[in-house]
Amino acid sequence: MVITRDFFLFLSKSGFLNKMARNWGSRIAAGKIIGGNDFNSSIPTIRQLNSQGLSVTVDHLGEFVNSAEVARERTEECIQTIATIADQELNSHVSLKMTSLGLDIDMDLVYENMTKILQTAEKHKIMVTIDMEDEVRCQKTLDIFKDFRKKYEHVSTVLQAYLYRTEKDIDDLDSLNPFLRLVKGAYKESEKVAFPEKSDVDENYKKIIRKQLLNGHYTAIATHDDKMIDFTKQLAKEHGIANDKFEFQMLYGMRSQTQLSLVKEGYNMRVFLPYGEDWYGYFMRRLAERPSNIAFAFKGMTKK
């Protein structure tokens, strides 16, 4: 039986399985696919990765906040995380979704919360990446990024190759000298807004990698796909793009040896390290993004 992307996306939305994962799954996931239940418990993992030459970006799992109070709590938690990264001298960025700061509640609330976060990030020179979510929230997310990029240096965002609009988005952002993380995309979207065929997504991914790098902007190529890694290496070689102009990003717990090999080859390699109790939906979406990762994922989860 071929395990498909839609299968994992279906599982990611299961309330029952999510509840089960919260109740007992964190013991399995912690240290295998997530750093821990909170940021402080993830610090030893960050230190270990840093000692191997790997940079990190941390992400507190859990989005779609529907309370202003919870959104402000998430904001304060993020501010404390940034301060701790600086105090502990960890080589780490911070990633966060705008829905966790109140995107679905009130835009003024999001701007209030992001202003506080980025003021702290600028003070400590810690990069904050605004994660991209589903297509219906894409424009609002990009508008937020554009507004803050005009005022702050330490802010980046994410673009998804499976959306038709992404090449134009890169053109629209060009004047801001943006640091972009480029991904294929993991949400289930209509054929009206996204490429339905993997081959088309792959070709568009190459196209946006090429455009962003040749535009001269720092780029994070977030992929486990060897073909995309090799494409990026060859592109950089052909156009004389220095290794300090881009980085590769991979998920914690997947393809660890490949990550270390890239470091040995002289490439920047950053590990996406999530933490928190809401790990199940994240895990299923990552498998949906590339079902072949299932072997790497479960090997990592069962390794002692």
From Swiss-Prot:
Its cofactor is FAD. The active site is at 131, 181. It catalyses: L-proline + a quinone = (S)-1-pyrroline-5-carboxylate + a quinol + H(+). GO terms for molecular function: FAD binding; proline dehydrogenase activity. SUPFAM superfamilies: FAD-linked oxidoreductase. Pathway: Amino-acid degradation; L-proline degradation into L-glutamate; L-glutamate from L-proline: step 1/2. The record marks 272 as: Critical for catalytic activity. Substrate binds at residues 97, 285-286. Converts proline to delta-1-pyrroline-5-carboxylate. This is Proline dehydrogenase 2. It comes from Bacillus subtilis subsp. natto. The lineage of its organism: Bacteria, Bacillati, Bacillota, Bacilli, Bacillales.
